[in-house]
């Protein structure tokens, strides 16, 4: 089993991270090789509004013509990435920020012409990640990628899943502001994709948790061994390195 763990932190969480989160990263780093992938949706939306550019999404993906891609790149690879790197370093964690363009890290296939510069991960070149980790740095990845010398926006969840699959990671951890999946007020500690589908159909999982668990299932189908959904505002890592939250694993007949 691989000793890599990929942590995905959504853009809406970045300004809420506290000392507990960084202590958990330190605990993970004692057991595993850690990679962090971040989003940046709220900051991108705010910057687009300042530039008088419409925010449009289709099927959960940001419509990204050239002028939007310029803003996405500026925010994700610039202010958002460096803010997280600086925060990690403030907590005595050695971090290096980079994007999916660096070292040909994230190579993408365009999704469709209708939504512009949006890509799906086609191939992950892991050499840069492994090199940084071998020098005891935490790679902090902005989810943009390349295709034919053009830069593309990537959904941060699928970017994290692609990286985790390429590294044969032990675990992909989604940082959220809730404890995990709740059923009748109680935390569901372990589940699989069949039970997740049942939960959605029966209204147990609703609202913003649906895309999180769908991303977890997609990650498993890409080859990730297990996915945990945890509350980044609380201590989500046990001393053993196990996560406190909802852990989703493969069912017996997952495709």
From Swiss-Prot:
<keyword id="KW-0028">Amino-acid biosynthesis</keyword>
<dbReference type="GO" id="GO:0042450">
    <property type="term" value="P:arginine biosynthetic process via ornithine"/>
</dbReference>
<dbReference type="GO" id="GO:0005524">
    <property type="term" value="F:ATP binding"/>
</dbReference>
<keyword id="KW-0547">Nucleotide-binding</keyword>
<feature type="binding site">
    <location>
        <position position="62"/>
    </location>
    <ligand>
        <name>substrate</name>
    </ligand>
</feature>
<dbReference type="GO" id="GO:0003991">
    <property type="term" value="F:acetylglutamate kinase activity"/>
</dbReference>
<dbReference type="GO" id="GO:0006526">
    <property type="term" value="P:L-arginine biosynthetic process"/>
</dbReference>
<keyword id="KW-0418">Kinase</keyword>
<comment type="function">
    <text>Catalyzes the ATP-dependent phosphorylation of N-acetyl-L-glutamate.</text>
</comment>
<keyword id="KW-0963">Cytoplasm</keyword>
<feature type="binding site">
    <location>
        <begin position="40"/>
        <end position="41"/>
    </location>
    <ligand>
        <name>substrate</name>
    </ligand>
</feature>
<comment type="pathway">
    <text>Amino-acid biosynthesis; L-arginine biosynthesis; N(2)-acetyl-L-ornithine from L-glutamate: step 2/4.</text>
</comment>
<keyword id="KW-0808">Transferase</keyword>
<keyword id="KW-0067">ATP-binding</keyword>
<feature type="binding site">
    <location>
        <position position="153"/>
    </location>
    <ligand>
        <name>substrate</name>
    </ligand>
</feature>
<feature type="site" description="Transition state stabilizer">
    <location>
        <position position="212"/>
    </location>
</feature>
<dbReference type="InterPro" id="IPR001048">
    <property type="entry name" value="Asp/Glu/Uridylate_kinase"/>
</dbReference>
<comment type="similarity">
    <text>Belongs to the acetylglutamate kinase family. ArgB subfamily.</text>
</comment>
<feature type="site" description="Transition state stabilizer">
    <location>
        <position position="8"/>
    </location>
</feature>
<keyword id="KW-0055">Arginine biosynthesis</keyword>
<dbReference type="InterPro" id="IPR036393">
    <property type="entry name" value="AceGlu_kinase-like_sf"/>
</dbReference>
<dbReference type="InterPro" id="IPR004662">
    <property type="entry name" value="AcgluKinase_fam"/>
</dbReference>
<dbReference type="Pfam" id="PF00696">
    <property type="entry name" value="AA_kinase"/>
</dbReference>
<dbReference type="GO" id="GO:0005737">
    <property type="term" value="C:cytoplasm"/>
</dbReference>
<protein>
    <recommendedName>
        <fullName>Acetylglutamate kinase</fullName>
        <ecNumber>2.7.2.8</ecNumber>
    </recommendedName>
</protein>
<dbReference type="InterPro" id="IPR037528">
    <property type="entry name" value="ArgB"/>
</dbReference>
């Amino acid at each position: 089993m691989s000793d890599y763990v990929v942590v995905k932190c959504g853009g809406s969480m970045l300004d809420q991270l506290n000392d507990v989160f960084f202590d958990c990263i330190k605990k993970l780093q004692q057991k595993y090789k850690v990679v962090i992938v971040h989003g940046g949706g709220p900051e991108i939306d705010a910057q687009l509004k300042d530039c008088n550019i419409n925010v449009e999404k289709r099927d959960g993906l940001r419509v990204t013509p050239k002028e939007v891609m310029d803003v996405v790149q500026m925010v994700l690879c610039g202010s958002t990435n460096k803010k997280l790197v600086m925060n990690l370093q403030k907590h005595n964690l050695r971090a290096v920020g980079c994007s999916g363009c660096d070292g040909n890290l994230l190579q993408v296939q365009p999704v469709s012409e209708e939504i512009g510069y949006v890509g799906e991960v086609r191939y992950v070149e892991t050499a840069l990640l492994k090199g940084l980790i071998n020098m005891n740095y935490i790679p902090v990845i902005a989810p943009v990628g390349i295709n034919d010398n053009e830069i593309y926006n990537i959904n941060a969840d699928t970017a994290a899943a692609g990286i985790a699959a390429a590294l044969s990671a032990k675990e992909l951890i989604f940082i959220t502001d809730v404890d995990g999946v709740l059923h009748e007020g109680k935390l569901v500690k372990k589940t699989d994709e069949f039970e997740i589908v049942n939960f959605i159909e029966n209204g147990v999982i609703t609202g913003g948790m649906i895309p999180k668990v769908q991303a977890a299932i997609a990650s498993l189908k890409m080859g990730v061994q297990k996915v945990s959904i945890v509350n980044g505002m609380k201590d989500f890592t046990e001393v053993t390195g196990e996560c406190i939250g909802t852990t989703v694993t493969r069912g017996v007949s997952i495709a």
